[in-house]
Amino acid sequence: IYTGQLVRDCANLFERKQELLTEWSSVFESGAGIIAISNAIENTSVVDIATTNFEEIINSEKLNGNVGDHFAKPGANDRIWNSLQKHCMKDPQNFIDYYCSEAIALASEAWLGPNYQVTAQVNRVNPGGKAQNAHRDYHLGFMSGERSASWPLHVHAMSPYLTLQGAIAHCDMSIESGPTLLLPYSQLYRRGYIDFSNEKYQKFFDKNAVQIEMTKGDAVFFNPAVMHGAGNNKTKSVKRMAN
């Protein structure tokens, strides 16, 4: 867990920046696989404006029949697919203010190197929304275990190096509201893309996954092969939004 101010300080000092990038790369590859950054977006009013933009997009898309998530039950959540482009088109200045975060830049560079490309989707888990099924993401995570098994093992090992997963909190996230469940070190399990839907593995995840409370503007970044899933939103009023 790191403070946003430490990250911003390191961003402007070459040696400290390189030390931080090296540390994070090691965490993503062979450590817990996860870092958290408090106050990753320094000015939370930027987050508030983005939240308003996202809510307006969600409401507009609902009128056109947009549905939520392939890893959650219908009605549990709302999604904005390709929120990056939609955000930019709706409010270019807020888009710039939001994505100029040093935390986003350094976390991405630590794992992907320079010249990475950003994609984004919004997930808003509504009050009473049930947890997602635990899963991995990109690129082998969006198919059955039987299908992913048709790729050789070295592809399973390579795939997580092509993407970094991250999320910015758009509201305060208590444990009761169900912040993302994560299974530290699970990126080290080479067969994870094949076995993640296995009932035995799902039960292991349920028993051992961890959560951290987040406040608005905090961020979490993790190796996409880390088993994860949105938690149960047990609140009656919190619409838990992350981008």
Regions found by a protein language model. Give the residues of each.
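Non-heme Fe(II)-dependent double-stranded beta-helix
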Residues: 1-146
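Catalytic micro-motifs at enzyme active sites that drive phosphoryl/nucleotidyl and oxygen chemistry
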Residues: 23-25, 153-156
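Beta-sheet entry/capping signal
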Residues: 32-35, 115-116, 179-180, 218-220, ...
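A structural signal for short, well-ordered beta-strand segments
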Residues: 120-122, 166-168, 242
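Short, solvent-exposed loop/turn segments at the edges of secondary structure
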Residues: 131-133, 161-163, 237
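Double-stranded beta-helix
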Residues: 147-151, 157-229
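A short hydrophobic beta-strand segment most commonly corresponding to one strand
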Residues: 184, 236-243
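Asparagine-centered strand-capping/turn motif at beta-strand->loop junctions
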Residues: 232-233
